[in-house]
Regions:
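Active-site loop segments of alpha/beta catalytic cores
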Residues: 1, 9, 33, 80-261
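Amphipathic repeat-derived elements
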Residues: 1-21, 66-79, 202-208
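N-terminal basic, low-complexity leaders that serve as flexible interaction/assembly modules and, when applicable
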Residues: 1-56, 91, 95-98, 140, ...
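Glycine-rich, proline-tolerant flexible connector loops at the mouths of alpha/beta enzymes
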Residues: 34-66, 72-82, 160-180
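Short, flexible, mixed-charge acidic loops at enzyme active sites
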Residues: 51-58, 62-67, 118-128, 238
């Protein structure tokens, strides 16, 4: 797809026109019924002071520093939406809204406070603190980061997004349903009413054991991966929340047949 539209990583992470062009190519060339101009999980973390290696054509961006590994207070810049790594997404959404807003659904993407905490403190460090019972410490960090999620999501709606995917990686192989219920669910219930548009929660991996919790968090939809039993998900929470996804992107979508998909 990059070859077909003459746009590639890392340019598409850093330049709004390249970002919009690559998103549009997914619709015009591959036939996707949405355009989503964000390909990294590090747009916010770069704006918050993380050292990010933006990779190359064949590798994804990677965080190289954890500026709050000591769980020190996080002071969010007042102009965070104007930081280059976040501004580029807003500008790309505006470009797409002007050009194809009446033809195709435009999706935005933000990181939730749990994922942002991974980037600020380091994933292993953050989860270790939870395992050690330092719950006040991790909740404090997530609360300091929650305004970033809210502000970026609202700005994306204002820029032209029809819907925003909120990714928060409290996945089954990293945290228990109890941890989600006690630590993150209250924050999700608090932030969802503060965002002015439909939200899709994305959590990777096998989350069969927390579907009911997700359904009660205030999101319009849950985007789930192939490890979740789709029939089971529909039976248990399909009457409470819309369900999206369940296609294995690295195997079925990439190497499978149309019939497989």
């Amino acid at each position: 797809l990059m070859d077909a539209c003459w746009v590639s990583f890392p340019q598409a992470h850093l330049d709004s026109h390249a970002m919009a062009d690559l998103a549009l190519a997914g619709h015009e060339i591959l036939g996707f019924d949405t355009v989503m101009p964000e390909y990294s999980v590090h747009q916010e973390s770069a704006a918050l002071g993380c050292d990010v290696d933006w990779g190359d054509r064949d590798t994804m961006p990677d965080g190289k520093s954890f500026p709050h590994a000591d769980f020190s207070d996080i002071h969010v810049p007042e102009n965070i939406l104007e930081k280059p790594s976040m501004r580029v997404v807003l500008d790309a959404l505006s470009i797409l809204r002007r050009n194809v807003g009446d033809k195709v659904a435009i999706m935005g993407k933000v990181m939730g406070p749990w994922t942002l905490s991974y980037h600020m403190a380091g994933t292993q460090n953050f989860l270790l603190q939870i395992g050690m019972g330092e719950h006040e410490k991790v909740i404090k960090m997530m609360r300091q980061l929650m305004p970033v999620t809210i502000a970026f999501a609202n700005a994306q709606f204002q820029a032209g997004a029809d819907v925003v995917c909120l990714a928060d990686h409290v996945t089954g192989d990293l945290a228990s349903p109890k941890h989600y219920q006690e630590l993150l669910l209250p924050l999700h219930k608090e932030l969802t009413p503060q965002i002015g548009g439909p939200l899709i929660l994305h959590v990777c991996g096998n989350c069969n054991d927390r579907l009911e919790l997700f359904a009660g968090a205030g999101f319009e939809a849950y985007h789930f991966e192939w490890q979740v039993d789709a029939r089971l998900a529909v039976e248990r929470v399909g009457h409470r929340i819309s369900l999206v996804g369940n296609v294995n992107t690295s195997e079925t979508l990439f190497m499978g047949t149309p019939e497989d998909v």
